[in-house]
Amino acid sequence: MNAFCSRQHRLFRSLVTVVGLVAVLCLPHPALASTNHHVILITIDGCAAYYLSDTKAPLRTLRKLAREGATAEGMRVSNPAITWPNHTTLVTGVHPEKHSVLFNGVLVRPGPGKPVRVDGQRDKPELVAVPTLYDQLHQAGYRTADINWPCTRRAATLDDSFPDVPDQISHMTPRLRDELIVAGILEGTNDATFRVQSAAVKDQIWTAAATHIIEKRRPNFMLLHMLVCDSTQHKYGPQSPAAYTALALADAQLAEVLRSLDRAGIRDQTTLIVTADHGFETALKIINPNVAFRKAGLLETATAPGILKARAQIVSEGGIAMVYFTDPSTFGEDQTKVLALMREQEGIADILSPHQFTALRMPDPATNRQMASLILVAKAGYAFNNEAQGDMSVTEVTLEIGNQGHHGFLSTHPKMNAPFIAWGRGVKRGARLGLIDNVDVAPTIARLLGQTLAGADGRVLVEVLEKP
């Protein structure tokens, strides 16, 4: 009898355990409530908002998404209007004053009298000062991925990563790298071989990598950054024949992403958001403040390109230039000299001081060592360059030299506005918005995936959602 009771007791305990486990598994899990939903955020680098209404721009796929989905008149970008800061704003919902990405890398100050430099070989934790949307989603159990997205090197919260860094192949997640080599998308593990590819070829590889992940992993949140439009416009200028060709290439890659949704069987569960990091403007005159600084004894160069010593130095962002003073012992004297020089410099529209940085949503140099002491603003038709050698503080651009297209102008410049198109699951078809802000993108994506992004500067774009 005792043995029988013991067996019955063990059986009962086992049954209770199984029933309890089933009950737990059947309970709704708030963190995983929307894991059958997918959002893909795509940036076409340098695709200005004005291209959507430009009849010369061959954007058949993008315009189809706009007709079938929701669009904005334009999207204001963050200062500085360059690639890495704005891609970071898109995934954090905050401006550079908070996320701290001010360049396409980290601004390094080696010490008094030594030139500053921008280092792009940095990991995500060294670059981004706040949590990202993909951090939050990954922690909630969502599958995450990025292809050529800035500031993602060694991001532990991306399940698949092909980061936007100089040595992309070395810093890919190993599983993805191995799969892409087997699939013939990558030729091998040599960074140098990949680095010399044209931007058009790289865009094809990045898109193929994205479609591979979509079909194999079905990520809940994917980031894809395409580059060919930016590199082409820098050389040939915006709204040039070459720029239109680059846009056609980007549009073709966008169509391939759509086809991959069908192959993966997730089109009806997917939302696409297509935007850009900045627009583009033509500038045919280049300002070289470092040349003026060298002539004034504030900077020294060597025979080879580069700066040997600098008490004052600019780092160009394109339409603005960041001014750094490296020696605290001569700061006041050097700043006075630079202000006098730049007030007389051709092509300078304004000189901004730290008390004006808050309005730009840029950090205070007193609390952020990457931030400049002054910002130079270019006049229309001008842009900045880091060149320190030569005799001319202003040079003219020719087609042979290239460098006709620029960004990095203040975000109030209308041509810096990016497009915004939302399409697919959860999007209100036909919704039309005015001018929005890029900080609105991350909280809106969070809502689409059943999450709330705490601490965002932006708002949820409820006007574009079927169920706000």
Model features per residue range: what roles?
Residues 14-28:
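Bacterial N-terminal signal peptides
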Residues 50, 200-224, 229-270, 336, ...:
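A long, amphipathic alpha-helix that forms part
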Residues 50-98, 145:
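Short, structured active-site-proximal loop/turn typified by the sulfatase FGly-forming signature C/S-X-P-X-R
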Residues 95-237, 332, 343, 385:
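His/Asp/Glu-rich, glycine-adjacent segments
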